[in-house]
Amino acid sequence: MAPERWDDEEDSVSPPPVAPRRRFDDEEEDEVLDSWDAAEDSEVEREKAAKAAEAKAKADAEAAAKKKSKSQRIQEHKEERKKKAEEEDSDSEEEDDADKRARLRRAQKDADLKHAEDLFGDIDLNRNRGAPKAIVISDSADPTQAVDLSAMPLFKPTTKEQFARLTSTLIPLLTPHSKKPHYSLWAQEFAKQLVKELNSADVKKIASAMTTMSNEKMREERAADKGSKKSKAAKTKVSLVTSRDNKLDADYDNGDDGLGDDDFM
């Protein structure tokens, strides 16, 4: 009977617990790095998605703006200017009159520039060192009415066609004053200022062109004077012949032939 008790004791003994495998330090660092990489990848993806959405929204806004007519853009510009003025008025109740006038002038100038952009096309407001300085034309009666001509594409020509357009715009504005006393003096000074930045070879070409034009003008004036002299001489000759004929007729009517009434007796 003793062996059976031993068997029971052996069956009742439980197996020893298995000790868990210990993780090494490098394994824990690898898991942390993997989690960081995953977080960085997700952050990069979110940034890419945000940039793509922003670019798409900007492109959609530009496309919608291009589809708008000029009248719609002008109307939106007026509404935007009115809204901006109202906001500035509400925010600057305590400002003095001088500051208010200066602010209104700046706002009007910005509004006029935007209005000119709507009328004449896109304006490059990112001026660099080579860009011309601002040429602001203001109304003497209302100083707040001012326009920067240098910002208009018309006054920033680069191609031959653009220079031709500039010429066709300025000439009709200037030549009507050619009969005024100071026009010729102004034209001389204006021409000097125009060629001031050119080299001597280009100035010589322009001077040669002016000489050619001067010679043509002289020929035209001489031809006109010659025609005028011929016409005047012809009129003088006709006048002399007519006067002589009238004198002869008058002498005949008056009996100025040297014969008296007694000569026939």
From Swiss-Prot:
Residues 1-113, 212-265 are annotated as: Disordered. This is Eukaryotic translation initiation factor 3 subunit J. GO terms for molecular function: translation initiation factor activity. It comes from the Eukaryota. Component of the eukaryotic translation initiation factor 3 (eIF-3) complex, which is involved in protein synthesis of a specialized repertoire of mRNAs and, together with other initiation factors, stimulates binding of mRNA and methionyl-tRNAi to the 40S ribosome. The eIF-3 complex specifically targets and initiates translation of a subset of mRNAs involved in cell proliferation. Residues 61-95 form a coiled coil. Signal peptide: none annotated. Residues 1-12, 26-44, 87-97, 251-265 have a biased composition (Acidic residues). The keyword Protein biosynthesis applies. Belongs to the eIF-3 subunit J family. The lineage of its organism: Eukaryota, Fungi, Dikarya, Ascomycota, Pezizomycotina. InterPro entries: eIF3-like_dom_sf, eIF3j. Keywords: Coiled coil, Cytoplasm, Initiation factor, Protein biosynthesis. Residues 45-65, 73-86, 216-228 have a biased composition (Basic and acidic residues). It is found in: Cytoplasm. GO terms for biological process: formation of cytoplasmic translation initiation complex. GO terms for cellular component: eukaryotic 43S preinitiation complex; eukaryotic 48S preinitiation complex; eukaryotic translation initiation factor 3 complex.
